[in-house]
């Protein structure tokens, strides 16, 4: 008999965090079926209805999206978001990232009452702006069960403490596309993340700029990777979280957090006691070294970067192919005099335009996903490591570790338009800031000095 999560089961699930489209809850009950699992529940989004295509196949994708993904029959016949997400990870992402670090999850049936109860239960723990934006979509009859990668071993604990780190790496390369406008050339020398920080600061979405630069994390240099991890620890925002045995000990749940204060730093140092065998005042430093060594040694970011680089044309190029795909006149070309390069995009066969847009959206998944690294200390009497491990020289400890990619959501086709608008907003604001700074510098330099 198929299992259905009912209203009475809602109390076993606790809020873990959320993104734009999903809530994530961790299991705190005793059923062996769910110990070591999280549940991913869709949030309510307008116009999320299944559509019949010309062949009468029901799909949650729009007709343009069905055309875009037409080579993948399983994907285009997805009747709801849970099925779509699972099939996208299984059929599109796993062939690119490999099965070792990706979990497609399994679907579980849920009752309306379960979803309503969960929605009510977690409201107080959610950031207010997230609550105002969307609630649980109670019209769904299934949710996605995934392994809880904040725990080292799923199922019953193997005894040792587990510390896990969640990193949202963001885009790790500078674009070189010939479609980038002359006025936007700063995009080729400053990371998108750094530019976006200025805009977020202007709109009070963050309290200060992050010290982190994704280019360091993806650099392939051991020293730069460590710098990136230290910067993430200092200014976590929503890019860095740490869990001890599944409980959050650093970072925010579902929202951006400010700088790591001395008080938070002391509490974190204390939480590492027993896990990192070092003197007081040195545990955090050793831990950040451990994370850095695992990121560098695993090589997972190299593969992720390859997928991010499927965005070959930048949004300034891909947007033209998008309008060809949806069969609409290109408003960007209408705005000004289109360049020869842009016209050449509109002259491409439709299959080429489809490929450009599809690869751009897959790259967008890779730019927005997170990686989860779980660590467990090895004892001297443990058998030889069978999986990945890292040695921490200052403490003479060895840790087994596992790396998983999470939040590998399919981006809606319609989002191409908002990607283009946001990109324009980010670069024009950054350009204005740079000009203002240069002008202020020139004025400062031209002032006569009084000796």
Swiss-Prot record:
Residues given in the record as substrate binding sites: 45, 130, 170, 200, 238, 368, 411, 415, 419
Keyword Ligase among record annotations: no
GO biological process: defense response to bacterium; defense response to fungus; defense response to virus; intracellular phosphate ion homeostasis; lateral root development; myo-inositol hexakisphosphate biosynthetic process; phosphate ion homeostasis
EC number: 2.7.1.158
Pfam families per the UniProt record, alphabetical: Ins_P5_2-kin
GO cellular component entries: cytoplasm; nucleus
Uses, biotech or industry: The gene coding for this protein might be inactivated to commercially produce plants with phytate-free grain. Indeed, while the role of phytate (InsP6) accumulation in seeds is unknown, it causes nutritional and environmental problems, partly due to the inability of monogastric animals to digest it.
Top-rank taxon, per record: Eukaryota
Binding site for Zn(2+): 320, 330, 333, 346
Name under which the protein is recorded: Inositol-pentakisphosphate 2-kinase
UniProt entry keywords in alphabetical sequence: Acetylation, ATP-binding, Kinase, Metal-binding, Nucleotide-binding, Transferase, Zinc
GO molecular function, one term: inositol-1,3,4,5,6-pentakisphosphate 2-kinase activity
Function in brief: Phosphorylates Ins(1,3,4,5,6)P5 at position 2 to form Ins(1,2,3,4,5,6)P6 (InsP6 or phytate). Phytate is a regulator of intracellular signaling, a highly abundant animal antinutrient, and a phosphate store in plant seeds. Also phosphorylates Ins(1,3,4,6)P4 and Ins(1,4,5,6)P4 to produce Ins(1,2,3,4,6)P5 and Ins(1,2,4,5,6)P5.
Entry-linked InterPro entries: Ins_P5_2-kin, IP5_2-K_N_lobe
Family recorded in the similarity comment: Belongs to the IPK1 type 2 family.
UniProt keyword DNA damage present: no
Positions bound to ATP: 19-22, 40, 147-149, 166-168, 241, 407
PTM-bearing positions, type N-acetylmethionine: 1
Tissues/organs with expression: Strongly expressed in leaves and cauline leaves. Weakly expressed in siliques and flowers. In flower, it is expressed in the major organs of developing flower buds. Strongly expressed in sepals, petals, in the male and female organs of immature and mature flower buds. Strongly expressed in the gynoecium and carpels which are fused to form the gynoecium. Also expressed in the transmitting tissue and ovules.
Cofactor note: Binds 1 zinc ion per subunit.
UniProt free text on domains: The EXKPK motif is conserved in inositol-pentakisphosphate 2-kinases of both family 1 and 2.
Short motif (EXKPK motif): ranges: 166-170
Reactions that this protein is recorded to catalyse: 1D-myo-inositol 1,3,4,5,6-pentakisphosphate + ATP = 1D-myo-inositol hexakisphosphate + ADP + H(+)
Required co-factors: Zn(2+)
Native source species: Arabidopsis thaliana (Mouse-ear cress)
